[in-house]
Amino acid sequence: MKKVKLAEIAEIFSGLSYRRYLDDKGIDFHVIVQRSIKKDGELSDFDNLKLSDFKDRYFTRKGDVLMKMPYPYDVVCVKEEGLVVSDRIAIIRVEKGYDPDFIAHMLTNAHIKKQLHELGSSQKLPHTSLKEIKELELVLPDYDTQVKYGELLNTINEKIAEDLKVVEYDRNLKEGILNQLWEAQ
């Protein structure tokens, strides 16, 4: 196991401040905004916007790790290329030799939340900066171990997502039964 700062193993920069690039004659893009990054590594619910003339660095690449900069600092490892990342989201491009899935899971850990709290501002709505994200210290095993843990933790996240769908289905079923009772009156 070795201790490293995130900036030592990744390029880290902010997403696109897309409002400057809005253009009715531009190209349609799926834009990752704050609500797109969900707890437990889920990525969905994009904005569809017409944009023009911005740098390729703001397009997702497979293996990018995205982190919300406002609290609760949700994190996701990107599987789909070509999405546009908006501002207030840190794009973390992990170097070869490190597993992005594992790094994404590490960034959701309580030790990282504690570091962000200690490094961060004392505002009512906590927010972190790129400088603070670059200073985060991670304890990393060798690459093969990272891959194994990354796969295991991905499987656990998938199970959590499925379990939450079952809970939502059961809530809807309960509500439907109660509504039928009201309608039977």
Give the positions of each predicted feature.
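Sequence-specific dsDNA recognition surfaces
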Residues: 4-20, 34-62
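Glycine- and charge-enriched low-complexity intrinsically disordered segments
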Residues: 101-123
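Hydrophobic residues at beta-strand termini and immediately following loops
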Residues: 32, 92, 136
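Short, surface-exposed loop/turn microsegments at beta-strand edges and helix-strand junctions
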Residues: 22-29, 58-60, 77-88
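Short hydrophobic interaction/assembly module
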Residues: 51-74, 133
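A short beta-sheet element
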Residues: 67-108
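A short glycine-rich beta-alpha junction/loop motif
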Residues: 84-87, 122-147
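Non-catalytic DNA-recognition/assembly elements of restriction-modification systems
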Residues: 1-21, 25-27, 135, 140-185
